[in-house]
Amino acid sequence: MIIRSILLAGSLLLASAIPGTLAKSDEPEIKVKELDKVPTSIYYFEDTDTIIFQKGLGEIYISTDAASSWEVMKDKTGLLWLNRHHTQSACIVGDKRKHWVTYDAAKTWREFEVPDKLILGERIQPFVFHGKDSNKAIINAEECLLTGCRRVTYYTVDGFKTIKKLLQDDSGCYWAVGHPNVGEGLDIRKKIDDRIFCILPGALPFNSSPRLVYSDKFFSDDMAIPVEINGRELRGINKFAFVKKFLVIATVSDGTSEAAIYVSRDAMHWDRAEFYGGPKVREGKFTFLESTNYSIQVNVASRRSKLPIGSLYTSDSTGTSFTMNVDSVNEDKDMYTDFEQVSGIQGIFLINRVDNAEEVKTGKASEKKIVSRISFDDGRTFKPLKYKDKEIHLHSITRPSNSGRTFSSPAPGLVMGVGNSGDRLKEYEHGNLYVSDDAGITWRKALDKAHKYEFGDQGSLLVAIFDEAGGDKIYTDEISYSLNHGKDWKKVKLPHTFLLLAEDKNKKFYVMSIDFSGLHERKCGKNDFERWAARLDEKGEPDCLMGHKQFYRRRKADADCFVKEKFKEPLPEIEPCKCTKEDFECAAGFKRNNDYDCEPDGKLKPSEGQCKKPDDKFMGPSGYRLIPGDDCIKKGGVDLEKEVERACKETSKGPISGKIAVEATPFETEGFQYRYLERSDTSSGDDETVIFKTDKGEIFVSKDHGKSWGRGKFKEPILEFMPHKYDKDVIYLLTGSKKAYWSIDRGHSFHAFEAKMPFTRTLGSLPLFFHPDRPDWLIWIGGEGCSGKKCNDVAYYSKNRGDEWELLLRGVNKCMFVGKEGELTNDDLIFCSQHEGEDPHKDMRLVSSDTMFSKKTSIHFDGKPIAGFTKMSEFIVVATKNGSELQSFTSVDGKTFAHAAFPPNFHVDFEHAYTVLDSSTHSVFLHVTEHAARGHEFGSILKSNSNGTSYVLSLNGANRNVKDYVDFEKIQVVEGVALGNVVFNTEEVKKKNEEKKFRSMITHNDASEWALLPPPKKDVDGHSFGCKVTDKGTNDCALHLHGYTERRDNRDSMSSGSAVGLIIGVGNVGSHLTARAESDTFMSRDAGITWHQIRKGRYQWEFGDQGSIIVIVAEGKPTKVLSYTLDEGETWTDFEFTDAEVTVEDISTVPSDTSKNFLLWTKKGSTTDLVVYNIDFSGLKERERQCVLKKDAPEADDYYLWSPKHPMQKDNCLFGHVSLYHRKKPDAKCYNGPRLDRLSSEKKNCECTRQDYECDYNYERQTDGSCALVKGLKPADPMQICKADPDAVEYFEPTGYRKLPVSTCEGGVQLDHIVARPCPNKKKEFEKKHPGISGLGLFLAIFFPLATAAAVGYWAFSKWDGKFGRIRLGESQPESIFSGDSPLIAIPVTIVAGTVAVITALPLLFSSLWRSVRGYTRLPGRWRQRPYASRGAFAARRGDYVGVVDDEDELLGAEEFEGDEEDEV
């Protein structure tokens, strides 16, 4: 009988003759194989004597006689890759495109080839095997082209005999049947056997949120079907995994670190998992553990502890309802968790927990006190491990000493581990070997000192080898073994003394096979076995789990025989039990409480016709159901599934009232501040949290949108609160001292921390700066040595939410984490503006570091002074001082800053300012102040190209206020639409100091062109306005709206991120904007194309339920009425919310505008106290049901597809497509519910035009719109792509143009590639890719178009009495059959013009032909290039013009980008 070979990596220490084999009959036989490299990937083919391992990354060794002899596999070198689902199958990945596969345990191998190089990364496997069909596999490869390497996925269904392409640019593909247990107990095999899930990038421009799609036909029909949950496409895919029969998806969304877990058992229907009783599941902070066929085990990491600690959850049989079992399980920094089930026995597992978890989490303990516990009832209870009268603690997964399982094997009930007795787990080197033969109930010490160990012959043989370091080295010359379950041990000398290390300077390594088959000649008989109960209760009787008792037939400990049943694992004997409470789990809509009972989770609803009165009772669900797969017998046992009588008061909601509900709460405060904690797509729960601060520094929290309030208990007043910029569940409260508070559970609880020093207000901003991707990383800027208003501001950083602080920099003005975005790839990168010499009176300079300024500091611009910096999207924008001017620089990688080229003769004085208007389309909007006199500020808005290096003028005279806010507002969701107010009397303002006069402007093509707002035809009463109204706004008659600079709360906006196309504003119709007191309220339903007046006078407004409810209330005067509309403003209804008039200071709702609740913040009469009204529209019958949206029939039910108009663009195209949005039909009586993906994937792409291109890097726009190389700059070597990618075949000569990254246009004008040339030494590949044209073909290609054009041109000339004139863009004339626009004339004219062009181009043509003979120049064909995604993608293709005639330059138009938020530099 053969046990597993023991791997010893070491050097031969005792010199002797060539080692021989021990020959004693009472000792095992040992054979040694010497190697010169460490053997890796040792694999045993099940049910065979074949063992295979890899030496380094090259040679592969194989043994077919259980390691007695070894040989090297000939002509097959590479990486060994095993098929874990099919134990006879494996692959060898060759170093090129040649690979091998076996299906018969390495007896035979078949060669196969993949067109591209396989991916061998830490996170990407080369093969993804089918769970049941060994012939099916997904193959992950990468294809390297001119623009870089891209992922390509292939598949095979016939054992690698044929390989076909599946997809490209995916982020991972998986078989639906990715585990042998998928579909267990369900008749779905035929439906999902060929189904493949793939993670793809976002389907829309700049939507990087990964989505999950599937196909049952290998995507051959180009149909990628999105996975949807309740009609919503699943996005933000973070992880895809198989846990036994369960398919599990983890998703994350912007604005929260919480992950949503979705589970399916049939690869067709998905449900979100709920976690009860512990911390929320966070992105990257959870691990799926070894699970059973009826539940999933998950470890969720704690967010607070600097020493890793987790919480262990166990699911019900659906995999969707998780209950926390252990709140302090031990884990390491890589999320490996000390958890392991005892092999083959249901319900028993060992864990290590942190006994001082609270002290560790709060920073009071510097190390973890780890103790071991065991559960015999599937995690309901845990008990200590007992050795005699002592507790023992064992090292587990986080400190592995064995390969494979840590404690157990298929040997029934045999468990071993290294540990110690006492009150806590000590270091491994201080441990002993312990063994249990009753599945962990009792333990005995097996051997002193730490040992590696292994099980053999179904547990009748235990083997151990010394594994404890003496100094830094482990010496051993013997092994130990036991034949009676570890009661007695014998030692066997090894041929030599070995040093157990991973590396050795002598480079000698050994594999030893140890054969114990000669120790017992007899094979075990019937009387040598016992019927062993796998689980015992407290009385020592066999215990039940999952409705049955489990027994094994195993060899008695003292039997002098071997089982000798090779390749056969023991199977349990099952004995059913009567049902008890433990055989039931919580039914859907219920959860476990602390007493392990099932209670409603808030979703319990009575049946139709029940609960007509609040005091009624009804027969409802018990909350329990029998666990699927449980074998218990209900007869004579417990049955918890029967319905029970329940009180109607238990129901989550009463009947729809048809009325609007109002709750009023008074507060003794004059001033107030409030913050909503917004919800993200993956946020769990349904709270609507508002946090409110009084002028006395008191904090009140409401979880139900202001219906009820709880007062926070803080020892000192709160001065400010700061919601986390990137995590919507987190908020910080700041006091006047070093003390501050945070909440990571949406205000449910608050925890105190101390900063190094109090924050100061000298910066004009709050002290905390957050990391975009690491929610617990903070920068705190406080003041030291403060004297009056003068402070030396110092920055500190923390990586654990303020538990510990380290010095970052002194003398700073601002510091911020950059995060990963675009080409910014370093998580640790920090930028700071620091005063020279740390002196607050001196100029600032820009510095950066990716080592927290502890080792390396980069000083940018040679230490020259800067005015400020900011980061927005993927750009870092800096304003430097250059004499009396400011200059702008931009970086996309945090290393190289490119000077931003402003339009000619556009200079910015030092005293003036930049305001950066944030962008979401890879460009920068910049407001440059041109006149800075207080109260008379205005400037110009510039727009950059996609790398922020070149600007064009977008809007002159844009209004700015003294706080540097700008009247510029991006209309949310709708692409390309923005509003702005301009000062039209700029000369009078500058020269005569007159008051500013404003006009409102709108753009529909992303600030390329602006127009006045068209006024409504009539006012709300049907009367005309006092000016001549036309379809377009004119200088004498247009609509003008008060903008961003006049708002009391800069969080207010004219539009909503969820109410598509709806805009509300306050203003007037006339020649210019008048005083706010004279304003009326206007609305647009089509993103600003048309407007109508909705109320006389000025009103405040809020959008609710994504625009299906809009509420307005009078501004600045007492009222007791609000008005609302349910049909996008077509009709309005007044509602009296109070008996006495109040003045509404503000109206608010959740920032996403998805709630049906609103808050009115009011003052009553002459009092200064505050009254907050909650207005709840949930009871309206018109909003009783949820709207239905079907993606395959988007206009069939409650929605329709709406496309915004872009009147200044041809065919409404913008960014290369016509956008389509899902909008609720105004008359649909339903509510939207969770936030919809408004932009439809059914967008229509347009042909490329000049608007889809911009100037390439090192090129700049000329006055005629063309692009030319910047004077003094040289293009980079376009052959760099060949150097960067050895597989590249060709490169393109630069044209000066590149496609906008945001554009999705197809075909049409192609300006970004003209001439292709072969890479060095790739002449043959280039010719194969671009076969040349024959001489005859060239003659025909030239002669026939010329002849045809001449004939048709002569006919047109003879039939048309007009004369050819000069063609200008934009001219229009009356149409006739012989007009220039008539097809009868336009086509011949085009042909004749083409003839003239061909004749003109003949010299260029012959020149080009000559060059093609010499240099293989290729004219553009049908090949299409991907849009540039980053600066690096186009940097390698710079250069001056080649083969581009001058007339083509005028095709390039203005760049198109968008921006929204503002940040002053």
UniProtKB/Swiss-Prot annotation:
PANTHER family: SORTILIN RELATED, SORTILIN-RELATED RECEPTOR. It is a multi-pass membrane protein. Residues 24-1336, 1405-1465 are lumenal. The chain crosses the membrane at residues 1337-1357, 1384-1404. Residues 1-23 form the signal peptide. It is found in: Golgi apparatus, trans-Golgi network membrane; Prevacuolar compartment membrane. This is Vacuolar protein sorting/targeting protein 10. GO terms for biological process: Golgi to endosome transport; Golgi to vacuole transport; protein targeting to vacuole. Keywords: Glycoprotein, Golgi apparatus, Membrane, Protein transport, Receptor, Repeat, Signal, Transmembrane, Transmembrane helix, Transport. It comes from the Eukaryota. Belongs to the VPS10-related sortilin family. Residues 1358-1383 are cytoplasmic. Functions as a sorting receptor in the Golgi compartment required for the intracellular sorting and delivery of soluble vacuolar proteins, like carboxypeptidase Y (CPY) and proteinase A. Executes multiple rounds of sorting by cycling between the late Golgi and a prevacuolar endosome-like compartment. Its main location: Golgi. Glycans are attached at residues 293, 882, 947. Pfam families: Sortilin-Vps10 (PF15902), Sortilin_C (PF15901). It comes from Arthroderma otae (strain ATCC MYA-4605 / CBS 113480) (Microsporum canis). GO terms for cellular component: cytosol; Golgi apparatus; membrane. BNR repeats lie at residues 374-383, 434-444, 481-491, 700-709, 1082-1092, 1124-1133.
